[in-house]
Amino acid sequence: MFVDGDWRTAHSTTRIDLIDPATEKWIASVTDGDHRDVAMAAAAARAAASKWGRSTPAERADLLEALANAFERRQDEMACLVTAQNGSVLSRSRRTNGARPVALYRHYANVARAFRPETTDTAAGAIVRREPLGVVGVIIPWNAPQSLLANKIGPALAAGCTVVVKPAAETSLDSLLLAEMATSAGFPPGVINVVTGGRETGSAVVGCEEVDMISFTGSTPAGREIAARCGQSLTPLLAELGGKSAAVVLEDADLDVLAAKLIATCLPNTGQVCYACTRIIAPRTCFGDVVDEGCC
């Protein structure tokens, strides 16, 4: 685990083996964290939240920019590490777990620079004050872990929140590497914490009283369960669940290129992405041709 700016020995003694899906060889083992490990990480995040939340948007922007630079220097290492864990084609991993996270951290650095903690509407006699929520629990899947992680912790950090990250059990090493990068970039201890583990670890994050918000990407059934629990405690939840995206074919579409386009949109990452097209919508006037071309 990576907690409070350093590697920590977990309370849990259970380990999870990570296997390279391409070779079926053992890569490493990581802690299957329990509620005590989550509590340790959340306590560190809570302790860091006050000072981090009082930092200026410019200070947070500078650190996000530094993280982008640190990530960029090691992006190929990160891409190879993700591919070794989830089997993604390396060329794709270099985009989704290398170049894209770098761009995202730079984007959120710019968001932080433009952030205005307080605005005044003199006509309405109102003041709008934007304050960090506190500790955000982040739960991500294995298919594009670093893009998804950047899209979650980037805005949280920019807003002045601290985070407890629970990566997918299958892709744990890259999140630990990210935490190491963040420390080298200058993030204070406790701002970014990573607890590895499976379903029970994620459940502990959702149920932790020190966590003020949950950001989750994963399956629809898991999302329903998390939403129900967050509803009971009135914990804010941001959930990105399984999609049912459609490929829309218009009457003037070039059917000669349709099949290749469908493969690209329906089967990226062997179809293991939430936005993969699983439906085709076509006009009745060319429906038969679309079926014939799409099934070739």
Short names for language-model regions:
Residues 221-296:
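ALDH superfamily catalytic-core signature
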Residues 114-189:
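Conserved small-residue-rich beta-alpha loop and adjacent elements
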Residues 1-29, 62, 66, 115-139:
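Terminal low-complexity tails and localization/encapsulation signals of metabolic enzymes
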Residues 154, 212-217:
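Periplasmic-binding protein-like
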Residues 125-126, 194-212:
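A structured beta-alpha segment of the ubiquitous adenosine-cofactor-binding alpha/beta core
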Residues 161, 166-168, 196, 217, ...:
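Short beta->alpha connector loops at strand-helix junctions that form conserved
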Residues 25-115:
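Glycine-rich loop-to-alpha-helix module at the N-terminal edge of alpha/beta enzyme cores
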Residues 24, 60, 82, 105, ...:
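Residue-level signal for inorganic ion chemistry
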